[in-house]
């Protein structure tokens, strides 16, 4: 289910503080965060946020069409290595 409109988007406070600090200092380094559940706001456009995927921080450059989505949608947690080939097909 979608979040209620009267509640507004959810963003962790520590992430908002980091974004405000970067905007004030014009720093170009990625903002490192573990908050995959935070919603992308229009304030984030043009920033690079390194989102944790369980193993590493994946840098995500925020563009205008990402607004309203969650940060975790752009940092994949699973790597697909393909299905195993059938053993019968290998023998022939």
UniProtKB/Swiss-Prot annotation:
GO cellular component, one term: cytoplasm
Residues passing through the membrane, by range: none
Keywords: Ribonucleoprotein, Ribosomal protein, RNA-binding, rRNA-binding
Claim: Ribonucleoprotein is one of the keywords in the record: yes
GO molecular function: rRNA binding; structural constituent of ribosome
GO biological processes: ribosomal small subunit assembly; translation
InterPro entries: Ribosomal_uS19, Ribosomal_uS19_bac-type, Ribosomal_uS19_CS, Ribosomal_uS19_SF
The organism's place on the tree of life at top rank: Bacteria
Recorded family membership: Belongs to the universal ribosomal protein uS19 family.
Stated role: Protein S19 forms a complex with S13 that binds strongly to the 16S ribosomal RNA.
This protein's name: Small ribosomal subunit protein uS19
Name of the gene encoding the protein in the UniProt record: rpsS
